[in-house]
Amino acid sequence: MKKAEIKTEKGTMIAELYEEETPGTVENFVKLAKDGFYDGLRFHRVIPGFVAQGGCPYSKDPDDSRAGTGGPGYTIKCETDADKQYHERGVLSMAHAGRDTGGSQFFIVHDRQNTKHLDGQHTCFGKVIEGEE
């Protein structure tokens, strides 16, 4: 199983990726990471008890009002019919503005209680297994 290392100001998280269940999403995420796309980006949307969202290229500048609106310049298809499509604590899921419009933005789930409505709507493509505190 592939793993990803997500480095933040507060430490490093290790996530296992659901490459068998969501191959297109994992391939895209890994490619962006290897290409350095995510380097220096911030989690631009953090809502306690809900999610921490990152992956927007505009988030490098904390004063850029476009943070949360950017992407890689293309979109990918949702893979919400796969196994493991359950938004529980630690899950990595693709953010989007509508079905099949995601590209680079993703979020990490804080709490299952507030994310049940995301099941079947956003592709879950991994889960943090270390360092989520």
Predicted feature locations:
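Cyclophilin-like peptidyl-prolyl cis-trans isomerases
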Residues: M1-E133
